[in-house]
Amino acid sequence: MLRKLILITVATVFFACQLLVNPVSALELDEESRTVQYNEQGDEVVISIKEAERGKRLFNDTCAQCHLGGVTKTNPNVGLSLEALERAEPPRDNIAGLIDYMKNPTTYDGEIDIKEIHPNTVRSDILPERRNLTDDDLEAIAAHILSQPKSPRKQWGDGKVYN
């Protein structure tokens, strides 16, 4: 009887773990989902599956502490949804805009420099993980952020964005 109980418990745990483990979401993105705006002029790029996976890994390592799921923990009013990024000043709904923001962060309205309090590549003492990020790394992170709202599996950045 005890042996049956142990076997059932092990089987239950095994199958429960299978349900909890998600497949790699970058692989689920089709070409349309991987097409993101590159600059304010509207040029677009299609990121490869490999770039999408790299961007996801870098985002999880350096940004997800505060932006898990595209929500901003320190200010839930402003997330990383395309709508919120588009309304920022200057707009951050493109790769070039996000790279500029990651290097030189400003408030949502673009009025105040927040390098002293927001992680960036200039002041890596705030978040040491950003110390060695290259422009290619920042581009991969930006592409990941911009492709996530197009993912059919999950919501991204659905914080409180006021009209």
From Swiss-Prot:
Which coenzymes or cofactors are required?
heme c
For molecular function, the Gene Ontology terms on record are:
electron transfer activity; heme binding; iron ion binding
Set out the biological process GO terms recorded for this chain's protein. photosynthesis, light reaction; respiratory electron transport chain
**Keywords on record:** Electron transport, Heme, Iron, Membrane, Metal-binding, Photosynthesis, Photosystem II, Signal, Thylakoid, Transport
Binding note for cofactor = Binds 1 heme c group covalently per subunit.
InterPro entries the UniProt entry points to: Cyt_c-like_dom, Cyt_c-like_dom_sf, Cytochrom_C550, PsbV_cyt_c550, PsbV_cyt_c550-like
Q: Where in the cell is the protein located?
A: Cellular thylakoid membrane
| CC annotations in GO | photosystem II; plasma membrane-derived thylakoid membrane
Q: How does it sit in the membrane?
A: Peripheral membrane protein
The secretion signal range is: 1-26
**Chief location bin:** membrane
A Pfam family reported for this protein in Swiss-Prot or TrEMBL: Cytochrom_C550
| Residues that hold heme c according to the record | C63, C66, H67, H118
Q: Quaternary structure?
A: PSII is composed of 1 copy each of membrane proteins PsbA, PsbB, PsbC, PsbD, PsbE, PsbF, PsbH, PsbI, PsbJ, PsbK, PsbL, PsbM, PsbT, PsbX, PsbY, PsbZ, Psb30/Ycf12, peripheral proteins PsbO, CyanoQ (PsbQ), PsbU, PsbV and a large number of cofactors. It forms dimeric complexes.
UniProt record similarity statement: Belongs to the cytochrome c family. PsbV subfamily.
- Which purpose does this protein serve, as stated in its record? One of the extrinsic, lumenal subunits of photosystem II (PSII). PSII is a light-driven water plastoquinone oxidoreductase, using light energy to abstract electrons from H(2)O, generating a proton gradient subsequently used for ATP formation. The extrinsic proteins stabilize the structure of photosystem II oxygen-evolving complex (OEC), the ion environment of oxygen evolution and protect the OEC against heat-induced inactivation. Low-potential cytochrome c that plays a role in the OEC of PSII.
Mind telling me what this protein is named?
Photosystem II extrinsic protein V
